[in-house]
């Protein structure tokens, strides 16, 4: 490369090489953008699935709590009945 004043003289082969590298880099950047977009979409799907699962889990937790309360009420009822029957059979 020779210098002419404030300008740098670049050979035509170097210009072509730089253009080729620039084109390759632009393709690489575009490919990275596509990959990033795909990853972003997959992340969105995963986040939506997580929200759905959390919602289902909350519903199941509420349902299990209701069932536990029902079972507890039933156990108390049966315990009271058993106690009453035991005391009735023990009485003359």
Curated annotation (Swiss-Prot):
InterPro entries: LSU (IPR039282)
Coiled coil region boundaries: 8-63
Swiss-Prot/TrEMBL keywords: Coiled coil
Zinc-finger recorded as keyword: no
Mutant lacking the gene: phenotype: Defects in flower and inflorescence development in short-day conditions and delayed flowering.
A Pfam match: LSU
Induction comment: Accumulates in response to phosphorus, nitrogen, potassium, or iron deficiency.
Biological process terms in GO annotation: cellular oxidant detoxification; regulation of flower development; regulation of short-day photoperiodism, flowering
Job of this protein: Required for flower development in short-day conditions.
Protein name: Protein RESPONSE TO LOW SULFUR 4
Source organism of the structure: Arabidopsis thaliana
